Amino acid sequence: MELSDEMLKEMSYVKISQYRTKVMKALEDDIKIPSKIAKDSDIRQNHISKVLAELRAHELVECINPEVRKGRLYRLTDKGNELVKNIE
């Protein structure tokens, strides 16, 4: 499958950060709260919020219930799903 230039740039953006890569893989095929993402990716929870904000800014993840303060649910966007399938 031929990847667009934009997708290659996004893939590079994710791959240069071990944290971003781990969070993307933790969200593959699942919806999770930040504490579960932290546990599954072996990253301390205080880093997860920053990584999720970065990935949201690039439209790779989305928060399903942004109106709640605790227990926010995150999942990959279509763009994020396409990208994570191409990360080794």
Feature locations, PLM:
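Glycine-centered, phosphate/nucleic-acid-interacting loop/turn motifs that mediate DNA/RNA or nucleotide
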Residues: 59
